[in-house]
Curated annotation (Swiss-Prot):
Sorted UniProt keywords: ATP-binding, Coenzyme A biosynthesis, Cytoplasm, Kinase, Metal-binding, Nucleotide-binding, Potassium, Transferase
Database matches in InterPro entries: ATPase_NBD, Type_III_PanK
Protein name: Type III pantothenate kinase
Active site per UniProt: 108
Cross-referenced Pfam families: Pan_kinase (PF03309)
Cofactor (UniProt): NH4(+); K(+)
Enzyme Commission designation: 2.7.1.33
Cofactor note: A monovalent cation. Ammonium or potassium.
Described function: Catalyzes the phosphorylation of pantothenate (Pan), the first step in CoA biosynthesis.
Residues annotated to bind substrate: 99, 106-109, 184
Coiled coil regions in record: none
Annotated Gene Ontology cellular component terms: cytoplasm
Length: 256
């Protein structure tokens, strides 16, 4: 079995695959932890889900938080006796990356694109990842990674208001029933949710026109906040494990 780990700005998200089937999922705060803390956590979460650590034959990591990388890699070697595969610049992806500097593309965005083109071949695809940042990736039917857009995510937008103003509070991120808030909290929740929704609609329209000349596209959504937009007609498919699937596929491309 293969343990796939996505190190994001807010959480470490992981899963265990048996072949192409995911057997378990877990989350952990990605605030910097020692290698021992990470190793103990990983072994514990596996055992709690009736997955013996000894069944893990391969570990693959995708990270956008460099300060966690060394500790996590050390944990894999010390606690699993496995040198993990790291999805990074220079590895095989199966994509033609059109960024001016391909090294700049986040590993999580590459993982999403790998999984998207594998699951939905020969299609023009927009992937929206609703995480700490909300990211858009445009991938052509020929597996060209064309680029995309990045904007603050819902949590980041709400936190910016509470941290940079004197009287605006921190709020829970929810889909409000009314766009017209009747309290400060409701107004922030509405502004954050419908502001991101509106931005997404505009970006989809513009990317569709600019990247794909209005040709048929498929829109995929993933990330921790994606389900909040499930009834808004933004996307064709919600794929919660897209990044983990991409990490697994990248590892299979690059390791024996």
């Amino acid at each position: 079995m293969i343990l796939c780990i996505d190190v994001g700005n807010s959480h470490i998200y992981g899963g265990v695959f048996d072949g192409d089937e995911i057997k378990l999922r877990f989350r952990h705060t990605s605030k910097v932890s020692t290698s021992d803390e990470l190793g103990i956590f990983l072994k514990s979460v596996l055992r709690e889900n009736n997955c013996s650590p000894e069944t893990i034959r391969k570990i693959a990591i995708c990270s956008v938080v460099p300060q966690v990388d060394y500790s996590l890699r050390s944990a894999c070697v010390k606690y699993f006796s496995i040198d993990p595969f790291l999805l990074q610049a220079g590895v095989k992806t199966g994509l033609n990356i059109k960024y001016r500097n391909p090294v700049e593309v986040g590993a999580d965005r590459i993982a999403n694109a790998i999984a998207a083109t594998h699951s939905f071949p020969n299609q023009n695809i927009i992937v929206i990842d609703f995480g700490t940042a909300t990211t858009f990736c445009a991938i052509s039917h020929k597996k060209a990674y064309l680029g995309g857009a990045i904007l603050p995510g819902l949590r980041l937008s709400a936190d910016a208001l509470s941290k940079n103003t004197a009287k605006l509070p921190s709020v829970e991120i929810i889909k409000t029933e009314s766009v017209v808030g009747r309290s400060t909290i409701e107004s922030i929740q509405s502004g954050v949710y419908y502001g991101v929704l509106g931005a997404c609609k505009e970006l989809i329209q513009r990317i569709h026109h600019e990247a794909f000349n209005g040709d048929q596209i498929l829109i995929l959504a993933t990330g921790g906040f994606a389900s909040l937009f499930d009834k808004q007609g933004l996307y064709d498919h919600l794929v919660p494990d897209l990044v983990l699937q991409g990490i697994r596929l990248a590892a299979m491309m690059n390791t024996a």
